[in-house]
């Protein structure tokens, strides 16, 4: 068993369009602001209360950054899986500042669009794991948080003429 686990899963809405930039190395990076909300009733007053948390997400996986740039817009509902990282930086006055972010590294992390406007309202899942040569993984089912398998060519999914016969 591993000594520790650093895994963050969020389901929320984008507060703004993704911010896309390039590092000095030429690698594409996407920055997202995701809102997660919870609501409850106050036991004493019966009043409905809401609280929204804002999360900074940084995508270093070039393929996932391209997906974010092309498909994600303000208000989009997404599933994000990454790791929590805190970085130290200095402001204009030389004071140390800290930022905690959910980071999707080159070969780790997942991004799924939950309210895709594609045919049939299906969500799309894009994973960054493994050493596959395919650009991204596609999951045709909106409720599946995992990956169904590598995409085949430009079709973006599995062939529709699969044999309907179950092999067992």
From Swiss-Prot:
GO cellular component entries: nucleoid
Keyword line: DNA damage, DNA recombination, DNA repair, DNA replication, DNA-binding
PROSITE patterns: SSB (PS50935)
Protein name, per record: Single-stranded DNA-binding protein
Signal peptide: none
Record Pfam families: SSB
Start and end residues of each stretch annotated as Disordered: 113-168
Domain SSB: 5-111
Molecular functions per Gene Ontology: single-stranded DNA binding
Organism field: Brucella suis biovar 1 (strain 1330)
Gene assigned in the entry: ssb
Claim: Cell cycle is one of the keywords in the record: no
Alphabetical GO biological process terms: DNA recombination; DNA repair; DNA replication
Subunit: Homotetramer.
Low complexity composition-biased segments: 147-159
InterPro entries in UniProt: NA-bd_OB-fold (IPR012340), Primosome_PriB/ssb (IPR000424), ssDNA-bd (IPR011344)
Residue numbers covered by motif Important for interaction with partner proteins: 163-168
DNA-binding feature ranges: 54-60
Keyword Zinc-finger found: no
Residue spans crossing the bilayer: none
Summary of the function given for this chain in its UniProt record: Plays an important role in DNA replication, recombination and repair. Binds to ssDNA and to an array of partner proteins to recruit them to their sites of action during DNA metabolism.
